């Protein structure tokens, strides 16, 4: 598994000041994707336990509200085990900080029954669709994408949108 970059202080991908990791590899190839350099599964840098340690360390400051996971596609079958490992470790160390994740997969069709969902607080799901692009939307690029409260969705066994 590989990653493209880590942003130490990110204010555009989730609420508050966050640490963001952009995983490498995506098979969706959305038209006009903002992050095409993350498509190649062989690009970027190796994702190791040391990288997880670095992310955990970067999140230690009180002003960091959580971790954001983007891509590429962190939930792709080639990446999901590493994503799960990162999420588990993050929540062990920071149970009161949030994990936000972006995926082209639909939560109710692919992720609802995956173990990684137990650790994610907010998920933006759905592929970016150029024809539905709306720059006024918060945390997403196109109107088909949903901002989901994952824990409430799991509890209710149906998609519950995140309202803030």
Model-derived features with residue positions:
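Conserved, mostly hydrophobic/aromatic
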Residues: 21, 30, 123
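Conserved C-terminal portion of the radical SAM core fold
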Residues: 60-69, 93-94, 98, 124-130, ...
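A generic structural signal for alpha->beta connector loops
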Residues: 96, 119-120, 144
């Amino acid at each position: 598994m590989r990653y493209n970059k880590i942003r130490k202080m990110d204010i555009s991908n989730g609420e508050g000041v966050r640490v963001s990791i952009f995983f490498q590899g995506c098979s969706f190839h959305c038209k006009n994707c903002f992050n095409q350099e993350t498509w190649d599964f062989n690009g970027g840098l190796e994702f190791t336990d040391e990288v997880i340690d670095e992310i955990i360390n970067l999140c230690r400051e009180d002003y960091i509200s959580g971790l954001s996971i983007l891509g590429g596609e962190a939930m792709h079958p080639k990446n999901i085990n590493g994503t799960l490992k990162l999420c588990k470790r993050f929540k062990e160390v920071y149970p009161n900080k949030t994990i936000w994740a972006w995926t082209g997969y639909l939560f109710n069709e692919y992720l609802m029954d995956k173990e990684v969902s137990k650790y994610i607080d907010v998920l933006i799901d759905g592929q970016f669709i150029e024809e539905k692009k709306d720059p006024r939307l918060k945390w997403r690029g196109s109107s088909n994408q949903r901002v989901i409260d994952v824990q409430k969705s799991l509890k209710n066994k149906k998609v519950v949108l995140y309202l803030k």
